[in-house]
């Protein structure tokens, strides 16, 4: 049971996409219509890594120092990962602050966090070095997170792999939903936060196949509805949470996927 607040972080969620498919997204569009939504200015740079770091810490990128996946200041014109460790976040995140105030938290698959750490509640990390970590470790058997499903980024890289890539994304969202559903059912906490990656990822890889205005749009194709279908999957789950957790406030947040 989550007593005070459920936060679902839906990465890359685009309001324009929701409006475009509003007839098929009654829960997401209904929330927009009922509660309105704020037009917020993004952090700079407007990228996934610094944006979620700001969401976690409340700090501007100039303060938390997490700027991008790559070192954009390098003189060499090469891809250089900008390495940061959990120490950049530990003790500074909103769930750490809530813990210090005596509130328990469940944190599911947080973006940017690698090995994770013990908190008052539950933490399930994203895959890192071939492993997903569950804290406390005694709860791993309850959740059994599937690293073979969630840890497959980069497996499919060519155009001929698009059908397999599509299937991979939908397997991932199902696993992210499964873990979140289990946590809501099993954890007696004050606040739950769960991060969903697939809306962002599928838009990166399939946008040109779904948008007739994209300069590389190939024309009618078998993948032109995959983004819509991913939003439908998320809409269905948001509806499930609203129906089953009527006494717990729900907050949807996102970051600019690009």
Q: Could you tell me what each predicted segment is?
A:
Residues 11, 55, 98, 194, ...:
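A residue-level signal for conserved active-site and pocket-lining positions in enzyme catalytic cores
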Residues 7, 27, 229-258:
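Metal-dependent active-site segment of extracytoplasmic phospho-/sulfohydrolases and closely related
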Residues 10-14, 33-39, 47-51, 70-83:
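Glycine-/proline-rich flexible loop or hinge segments
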Residues 59-218:
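His/Asp/Glu-rich, glycine-adjacent segments
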Residues 2-6:
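Extreme N-terminal starter segment of soluble prokaryotic enzymes
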Residues 18-63, 104-106:
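Short, structured active-site-proximal loop/turn typified by the sulfatase FGly-forming signature C/S-X-P-X-R
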Residues 205-241:
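Extended hydrophobic/aromatic segments used for targeting, binding, or gating
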Residues 7-9, 191-195, 251:
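Structural motif
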